[in-house]
């Protein structure tokens, strides 16, 4: 019996353990909406949109920019800027410790990435919020990176697009963070005066000081399907007004129906549809027209 254990059973158990450990971690992902178990490589092909229920999962700022801009000719704006704990703020944890933790978790210095590049050949500037960095909250660095992106658009007379995903102003920066609402709104007013298009794309979620400033100041405001958009959360509103809110309240579909946003576009359609829209707004050829002209020539 002892020989059987040594020769047969133990090697069998060891082989089983090796097989289990050889399966890469994160190969499968459960959809938070329909709970379907999805194969990660297949999910990446659909841009993190569930093929079963069309739920648009949250994605990082760099991933969003990677799938939106053309691959060539990109340049990051304001990458050298880093947050500073000027107020020595502390709640349950020191602000500087929260920053270090968020930077380690995301690999980013702060919650906004701005980049110049092209969209189907058209020069453009893009900003995208990183929600995983302290809830995409807006502080001094976020505001300054946004302003630098807008100034680049002004100097080069090219359109700007911002993908918002934020819980609002960063409370750890107090009045400094609130000032960013005015700062970003002011530079967008300059874009409008110069006739340079600004498109705001609202992704899940957009709340607080970001929704009350730059996110709602687009010449065209686009929402991703079923994105949560508002100032205060629905639970807070219900507790305040002591009434049951309508079904789907603060979802992008509800806002479209009531005229608060202009369009809802699925993630996979953002590139071609926004390219056509910007071509029309700037008087350029659409990508389709450019291809047709090249084919005729």
Swiss-Prot record:
Its cofactor is Zn(2+). Pathway: Lipid metabolism; malonyl-CoA biosynthesis; malonyl-CoA from acetyl-CoA: step 1/1. Zn(2+) binds at residues 31, 34, 50, 53. Keywords: ATP-binding, Cytoplasm, Fatty acid biosynthesis, Fatty acid metabolism, Lipid biosynthesis, Lipid metabolism, Metal-binding, Nucleotide-binding, Transferase, Zinc, Zinc-finger. Binds 1 zinc ion per subunit. Residues 27-296 form the CoA carboxyltransferase N-terminal domain. It comes from the Bacteria. It is an enzyme of class 2 (transferase). It is found in: Cytoplasm. One of its GO terms (biological process) is malonyl-CoA biosynthetic process. One of its GO terms (cellular component) is acetate CoA-transferase complex. Its EC number is 2.1.3.15. One of its GO terms (molecular function) is carboxyl- or carbamoyltransferase activity. Its main location: cytoplasm. It catalyses: N(6)-carboxybiotinyl-L-lysyl-[protein] + acetyl-CoA = N(6)-biotinyl-L-lysyl-[protein] + malonyl-CoA. Acetyl-CoA carboxylase is a heterohexamer composed of biotin carboxyl carrier protein (AccB), biotin carboxylase (AccC) and two subunits each of ACCase subunit alpha (AccA) and ACCase subunit beta (AccD). Belongs to the AccD/PCCB family. NCBIfam families: accD (TIGR00515). This is Acetyl-coenzyme A carboxylase carboxyl transferase subunit beta. It comes from Pseudomonas putida (strain W619).
């Amino acid at each position: 019996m002892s020989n059987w254990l040594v020769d047969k059973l133990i090697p069998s158990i060891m082989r089983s353990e090796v097989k289990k450990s050889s399966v890469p971690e994160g190969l499968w992902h459960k959809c938070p909406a329909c709970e379907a178990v999805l194969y990660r490589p297949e999910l990446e092909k659909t841009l993190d949109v569930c093929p079963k229920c069309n739920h648009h999962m949250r994605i990082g700022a760099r991933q969003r920019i990677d799938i939106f801009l053309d691959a060539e000719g990109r340049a990051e704006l304001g990458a050298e800027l880093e947050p500073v704990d000027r107020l020595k703020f502390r709640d349950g944890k020191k602000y500087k410790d929260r920053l270090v933790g968020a930077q380690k978790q995301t690999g980013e210095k702060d919650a906004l990435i701005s980049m110049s590049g092209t969209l189907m050949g058209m020069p453009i500037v893009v900003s995208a919020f990183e929600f995983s960095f302290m809830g995409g909250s807006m502080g001094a660095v976020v505001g300054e990176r946004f302003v630098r992106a807008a100034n680049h658009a002004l100097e080069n007379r090219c359109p700007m697009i911002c993908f918002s995903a934020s819980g609002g102003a960063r409370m750890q920066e107090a009045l400094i963070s609130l000032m960013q609402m005015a700062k970003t709104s002011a530079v967008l007013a300059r874009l409008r005066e110069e006739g340079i298009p600004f498109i705001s794309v609202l992704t899940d979620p957009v709340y607080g000081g970001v929704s009350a400033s730059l996110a709602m100041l687009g010449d065209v405001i686009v929402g991703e399907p079923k994105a949560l958009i508002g100032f205060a959360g629905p639970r807070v509103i219900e507790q305040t007004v002591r009434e049951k809110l309508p079904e789907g309240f603060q979802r992008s579909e509800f806002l479209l129906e009531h005229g608060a946003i202009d369009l809802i576009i699925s993630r996979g359609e953002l590139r071609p549809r926004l390219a056509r829209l910007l071509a029309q707004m700037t008087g350029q050829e659409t990508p389709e027209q450019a291809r047709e002209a090249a084919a005729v020539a």
